[in-house]
Amino acid sequence: MDIPAKKFGFFTASAMVVGIVIGSGVFKSAGDVINASGGNLTVALLAWFIGGLIIMISTYAFSIVALKNTKASGIIDYVEDYFGAKMAYMVGWFVQFVYYPVLVGILSWLAGDVTQILFGLDNAIWPLTILYFIGIYALNLISPRIAGKTQVSTMVIKLIPLVMIAGAGLVVGLFNGNTLTALSERATNVTAGTGAGLAAAVAVTAFAYDGWILALSITQELKDAKKILPKALFFGSAFIVAVYMLFFLGLSGVVSNNEAIVNAGSLDTSVIAAERLFGVFFGNVVSVMILISVLGTLNGLTMGAVRGMYQIAVRGHGPATRHFTDLAKNDAPVKGGLLSVAVSVFWLGVWYGNFQGWWGGFIDTSVLSIVFLYIAYILVYVDIVKNFDELPSWKRYGVPILATIAALYLIYGAFTSAPLMFVYFAGIVFVILGIGLLLYGPTQSALDTGKKN
């Protein structure tokens, strides 16, 4: 087996953390966090800080595992190494049938939302959603190479609107007094209900902070992984937290707490801020950058989604492994990708039902799909405590225990924000996992039979 060259240093590793995590989540979550905080900007800022602290603790805990097994490249590998193939299969099944398809659908909707605003369209968000949904899957199935190049090109663009709105908004807000007003006056149109509070707001930030685990995939390619990886994860995460909090304060300089809540769950708050700060033309330029950021995140998630079933099947477990390990001439796992399309349509339907009042409440699948993945993270933390006896006590016990508490706090916050919707979502997930468990079975994988993979 070929071993990748040791070619990446501290800066590249840190930049990868920033590039993967920063995306559309922070633009969408602005109003959501204020709403979940009960309209209190100070509580919302604290939520952003605590949410960032959670990913800093989580990334450090995972760096411990990554340095022990540099051949592994993600949560499924880590779980398989210490909890066996079946548990890893179940985690992979969750990622393929819940995590990826949920987020692909929602990101398609967000792209439709910002496009509708940019062009001043009415009632176009769902047709645009479908257009983006079909287009991004088609790109990844027909031309995966172009999809990969697209992902790299959008990384830098993601930072530009964040920095511009943060800087200009802070200056304007301090001069006009809006920032101080936002910090001192609670919003009056909160819709979060009895679940509003710090824990619920922290859970909402999980959507904006998601993706950090993917940065561990380059561990074996770092020049001095033991020194570089923990530092890169820490400083990269700290940079993200600082940018997010400054961006959030920048928004408060031109968008009131009440306005942010009215536009909760969409990108409208960020677009409004851009127009007020830079005028219609330059505001639209910033909005285009936000759209590019959304599409970059959507493309990255879709790249994972179309390969998810292949990653399950190639390990030799689950249904029709030979079927799902077949690759097209362009090396795209088309059959697994088409299954991903079908599953994403289902979850997009759940998201659509939120706006039609089908569920009697809002099932925030964007947050819940991420929060539920932290259950799998806890398995990794348990493994550190049980098996990493060569570590000093603070690493073997302190770090994983703190990371476990952080994960449980996120889960608690998601539950308290909307208990009934949490239960509905959990019910759907358990059914999906139950189906996966019924279909689990050791079969010969493509690797075992020498098929192309």
Regions found by a protein language model. Name each.
Residues 1-42, 55-56, 60, 71, ...:
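Membrane-interface "cap" regions at the ends of multi-pass membrane proteins
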Residues 2-6, 120-124, 153-287, 419-421:
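Helix-loop-helix junctions that connect adjacent transmembrane segments
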Residues 7-17, 43, 84-97, 129-132, ...:
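Select transmembrane alpha-helical segments in multipass membrane proteins
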Residues 57-133, 137-141, 146, 291-308, ...:
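Hydrophobic transmembrane alpha-helices that form the core helical bundles
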Residues 76-86, 108-129, 161, 219-225, ...:
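Helix-loop-helix connectors at the membrane interface of multi-pass transporters/channels
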Residues 77-80, 84, 117, 237-299, ...:
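TM-loop-TM module centered on a large, flexible mid-protein loop between adjacent transmembrane helices
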Residues 112, 125-178, 233-238, 372-375, ...:
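Membrane-interface loop-to-helix entry segments
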Residues 369-373, 379-382, 386, 393-453:
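A generic transmembrane alpha-helix motif of multi-pass inner-membrane proteins
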